[in-house]
């Protein structure tokens, strides 16, 4: 699909998905190393990225470019990934 044939709504959602994917990659890198809770800098970066994405989603929803339910689904996916990371780190500590 070319840029010309994509609607603004599709472009907005694609950009939000790309930003969400970057955050997921950040989470997965930390899962590979299981270092997240010991690293306050990482946690600060992740919190900032999540907050920024939530603001992007809110802006796109307010413009009518993205449905609120779709934006919530993106954030929910990130929350699940983050929860998985916390569980993995907790299991590592118990061992």
Curated annotation (Swiss-Prot):
InterPro entries: UPF0358, UPF0358_sf. Coiled coil: none annotated. Pfam families: DUF1507 (PF07408). Belongs to the UPF0358 family. This is UPF0358 protein GK1077. It comes from Geobacillus kaustophilus (strain HTA426).
